[in-house]
């Protein structure tokens, strides 16, 4: 790492500690050339995979778009913003855990439905009706019956 004081290339690490609940490493460094000390913070670069849409196009993961879709389904439902944010964090964590550079949008849609089902069954049905393109009342009934038969997966 370059010294921010003299620009030399050679610095040494004097001390390293975990900070931010283990999410960052704080390093105390010293320049070999000028002797000045400085602190750096290191964090892992956590990149979310790109999405492969049903038509084959690819686009970057858009957290705001995901949040807006979930908020639309949860509109006027008794679910706190904290619970919504926790569900979003869980989806992002699961996407990172795949280790893939790209995932099908279908996978994300299923993750959203699973999270909404845990949050609020009415919101789940709302989202499912749009996501699965329900055409008539029979499709709503089938989904509601399935919801009643199968417990939500934690």
Curated annotation (Swiss-Prot):
GO function terms (MF aspect): ATP binding; DNA binding; zinc ion binding
Domain ATP-cone: 49-139
InterPro entries xref list: ATP-cone_dom, NrdR-like_N, RNR_NrdR-like
Biological process according to GO: negative regulation of DNA-templated transcription
Cofactors, names only: Zn(2+)
Keywords carried by this UniProt record: ATP-binding, DNA-binding, Metal-binding, Nucleotide-binding, Repressor, Transcription, Transcription regulation, Zinc, Zinc-finger
Zinc finger (unnamed): 3-34
NAD is among the record's keywords: no
Pfam family, one: ATP-cone
Taxonomic superkingdom: Bacteria
Cofactor: binding comment: Binds 1 zinc ion.
Biological role stated in the UniProt entry: Negatively regulates transcription of bacterial ribonucleotide reductase nrd genes and operons by binding to NrdR-boxes.
Similarity comment: family membership: Belongs to the NrdR family.
UniProt-listed NCBIfam families: transcriptional regulator NrdR (TIGR00244)
Protein name: Transcriptional repressor NrdR
Organism: Pseudomonas entomophila (strain L48)
Lineage of origin: Bacteria, Pseudomonadati, Pseudomonadota, Gammaproteobacteria, Pseudomonadales
Gene: nrdR
